[in-house]
Amino acid sequence: MTPLVVLAVAIAGGLGAVARLVLDGVLRSRAPVSFPLGTTAINVTGSFVLGLVTALALGHGLPPEWRAILGTGFIGGYTTFSTASYEAVRLAQQRQYRAALLTGVGMMFLALGAAGLGLWLGGLAVAPTPPAPSTTL
């Protein structure tokens, strides 16, 4: 891996983190609830985008450098499963057990489903289209 790729991954990670900060701030201001809606939305959308990027990369042979920049860099900076874990523990400590369980387990299933959906849709986008039937004999 070249120094330029490492720099690009770092920049993309910073941009992903800024996108996370902005989206989380917008969601917190619009829906002031104890449930971590922003973190959930970020992790689910990030998982979807990573699934989509992965399928598109595999189907189009995206170079490994670009996979690192987009997946490890941007999406890695954007998603935040450590914050989700912290928020689940925080909710449990506050005796909000249902919200803690929903945050911990629910986010995992939602993120896995979103990643699978992204992989599937990305696979459809790169799947070869069958040739049209011939109308001539």
Swiss-Prot record:
MF annotations from Gene Ontology: fluoride channel activity; metal ion binding
Entry's Gene Ontology cellular component terms: plasma membrane
Regulation affecting activity: Na(+) is not transported, but it plays an essential structural role and its presence is essential for fluoride channel function.
Reactions accelerated catalytically: fluoride(in) = fluoride(out)
UniProt xrefs under NCBIfam families: crcB
Similarity-based family: Belongs to the fluoride channel Fluc/FEX (TC 1.A.43) family.
Main location: membrane
Protein name: Fluoride-specific ion channel FluC 1
Bilayer topology: Multi-pass membrane protein
Keywords assigned by UniProt, alphabetized: Cell membrane, Ion channel, Ion transport, Membrane, Metal-binding, Sodium, Transmembrane, Transmembrane helix, Transport
A GO biological-process term: cellular detoxification of fluoride
Residues that coordinate or bind Na(+): 76, 79
Biological role: Fluoride-specific ion channel. Important for reducing fluoride concentration in the cell, thus reducing its toxicity.
Segments passing through the bilayer: 3-23, 42-62, 69-89, 107-127
Subcellular location: Cell membrane
